[in-house]
Design a protein with these regions (language model features):
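Short phosphate-engaging motifs
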Residues: 7, 41, 115
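Subtilisin-like serine protease catalytic core
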Residues: 81, 92-193, 207-213
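Charged, often glycine-rich, active-site loop that binds/positions anionic groups
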Residues: 38-39, 191, 196
Length: 213
């Protein structure tokens, strides 16, 4: 955070010296600045020492088909492993002990059915406040309105212990999530909120002195 702050000082001071801007948001997670600024200032801004790139927010993302009206059928295969997992040859890593144990993953997607048996017991909110485990933009608590996020979280860390059906890569990892991905571009949260969600995931409890999260 300190490195980002130091490298952004001159840029922020330049922006603030002009009255032709609004909505200035500095970020440390990716060391960037979001600002709505008069286009005539962009050439001057680009000449500043610490400016590597200036990009225009286009708001483009691949649309995801909504599955909210479809029945979410769950099938378990005893001692099974998903073909995609076999395809990336992850077994040698598992045999070395790399199973996600003691790790925390972040699912940035459409939301999650937190009671899904493949990962419900490893939801971080079982142990810590919901504010540190769920960053909801559309819903204050985990939801499964669109099953895309539930599917991708399963790919990340799913495991049905009763049948030993291994769905995910890091099948012993704990997880946190958000619901920022939508089915249409028009429904997307502002880019500022999307970047902020990643910064939240870097430090969910807001305390730089803790590392469990």
């Amino acid at each position: 955070q300190e490195d980002a702050k130091n490298s952004q000082n001159d840029i922020i001071n330049f922006i603030k010296s002009s009255s032709n801007y609004k909505n200035l948001f500095p970020f440390w997670g990716t060391n960037c600045i979001y600002v709505e600024i008069y286009k005539g200032l962009i050439p001057e801004l680009s000449k500043l020492k610490n400016v590597k790139k200036i990009d225009l927010e286009m708001g483009l993302i691949q649309e995801i088909e909504s599955n909210s009206s479809k029945k979410n059928n769950i099938f378990f295969d005893e001692n099974g492993v998903e073909p995609g997992i076999e395809a990336i040859n992850v077994r040698p890593l598992w045999e070395m002990g790399y199973t996600g144990r003691g790790r925390l993953v972040f699912n940035y997607d459409t939301g999650v059915s937190s009671n899904h048996p493949a990962f419900s017991e490893r939801f971080f909110a079982n142990f810590y406040p919901m504010s540190q485990c769920w960053d909801g933009y559309f819903s204050p608590s985990p939801n499964g309105l669109n099953d895309h996020g539930t599917h991708t979280l399963g790919t990340m860390c799913g495991l049905v212990e009763e049948t030993n059906d291994t769905i995910g890569i890091a099948f012993e990892a704990y997880w946190i999530a958000n619901d920022f991905v939508t089915s249409t571009v028009e429904e997307l949260p502002p880019v500022v909120d999307m970047i902020t969600s990643f910064e939240w995931a870097f430090n969910p409890d807001g305390d730089l002195n803790t590392d469990f999260d």
